[in-house]
Amino acid sequence: MQTEKRKHQRIHIALPVFLKNGTGTTRDVSASGMFFWMAGLCTAGDFIGFEVELRRPVGKMRLKCNGSVIRTESRNSDIGVAVKITDSSMEQA
């Protein structure tokens, strides 16, 4: 039996992700990390910066994050990226 290693609950939600080398869509998000699909290139061990767009009734917000790529996986022409968030901030879009 495998022991669950996650510290925070994951929420399955599709949100737009913006990176320097592409765009993507989240599959799931937690307080300490997220998984997203993107058309671009990332490898395990990379340190990346990215933004997640959050839509609210009164306007958009951007969650700006830095993190380390824990693992990647392939699906057709997309790359799945699991990221551990090291720091983040929220801004009005």
Q: In which residue ranges do the predicted regions lie?
A:
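N-terminal helix initiation/capping motif
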Residues: 1-29
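Short coil-to-beta-strand transition motifs
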Residues: 18-21, 59-66
